[in-house]
Structures are given as structure tokens and as C-alpha cells.
Amino acid sequence: MASHEVDNAELGSASAHGTPGSEAGPEELNTSVYQPIDGSPDYQKAKLQVLGAIQILNAAMILALGVFLGSLQYPYHFQKHFFFFTFYTGYPIWGAVFFCSSGTLSVVAGIKPTRTWIQNSFGMNIASATIALVGTAFLSLNIAVNIQSLRSCHSSSESPDLCNYMGSISNGMVSLLLILTLLELCVTISTIAMWCNANCCNSREEISSPPNSV
């Protein structure tokens, strides 16, 4: 009889204190919408770092092409209409700065997924996507102007062969810049979509799994 009372007392104390791991602590229930990477697999962090590295390489190539186009301005100053885009917009410079900044922040946010780095990376990628759209418009306009200038090379007072040569080089370089800009736009949109998808999933988990009431 005494043994039964001891067993009942042990069961009562076990139920009062709860079994280990049966109740989640406040740290487990407190999930932040601003930290979508913490609870995700490692491949998402690696994906974010890869996208950031692509942005950095893309920015370096855009800057290099812009410098090359600018260097052609001086020896062939009479063909400046092929390179007006480089000097009047300056897109290869400030575009490369934005793209390199967003890529660097994405890499850092993948390594250290804190709230501050994630917010900075998200905002910078939105800015880079906007810059890429503006750059696409500038480059498309430059290609259209170059095509019209190439058609007038035959009636030019200078050397028609040199005019065609410079126009072809400018068109090729600007077309390559346009391809890199479109690639940057796709990368930034993919990064933004990944953040939004992770935040939406975390928000649904918080709504569907509220803390247990005492």
C-alpha cells in the first residue's frame, strides 16, 4: 500500500514538472520574420553567397567595359556620337558601384544572417534591380542611336570604313553591357524573391503555430 502511494507521488511530481523536451522554451517559439535564413538548410545560404558573387563579377565586367568604351572616346573624338551613353549617363560607373554593393551585402548576409545584414541586403538588391531597369533603358537607347549612326556612315565626310568600324565596336560593347545588365536584373529579382518567400513561410508558421497558452 505504501509502495502504491510512493509511485503515485512520483507520477504526480513528474507530471507537474513535465518531461524534458515536452514544452518548448521561449527561445524556440520566438522566431523572427527578419531572419529567414536561420531555420533554412545550408544550401540556401550557399545559394545567396553564389548570387552575391555573381553580382560582384558582373559589376567588375560592367565597369571594365565602361572604361574601355571611355578610352575609345579620345583617339576617335570625331566619332563621339557612338559613345554618348558612357559620358552623359555614367551608367558603367554608378551601376557597377550599386551592383558590387548589393553583391557584397548578399555574401555577408549569407555568412552572417542577422537582422541588420538581411535588411541591408534586401534594400540594396531592390535598389540594384531599379538601377538595372534604368540601365536597360539607357543601353537600349544607345543601341538604337548607334544603328541610326551606322546607316549614315556612308554619307559621312570622314572615313566611312572607320565610321563603320567604330560603330560596330560600340554596338558590340553596348550589347554585351545590356546582356550583363539583364543578368544582373535576373539575379537581383531572384534574391528578392528568395527573401520574400522565406519571410512569407515564416509568417505562416507563426500564424499556424501560436504559443501554447498556460
Swiss-Prot record:
The chain crosses the membrane at residues 50-70, 82-102, 125-145, 176-196. GO terms for cellular component: perinuclear region of cytoplasm; plasma membrane; specific granule membrane. Residues 71-81, 146-175 are extracellular. The keyword Transmembrane helix applies. It is found in: Endomembrane system; Cytoplasm, Perinuclear region. Interacts with CDKN3. Interacts with CDKN3-CDK2 complexes through its binding to CDKN3; this interaction facilitates dissociation of cyclin A from CDKN3-CDK2 complexes. PANTHER family: MEMBRANE-SPANNING 4-DOMAINS SUBFAMILY A MEMBER 3, MEMBRANE-SPANNING 4-DOMAINS SUBFAMILY A MS4A -RELATED. This is Membrane-spanning 4-domains subfamily A member 3. The lineage of its organism: Eukaryota, Metazoa, Chordata, Craniata, Vertebrata. The gene is MS4A3.
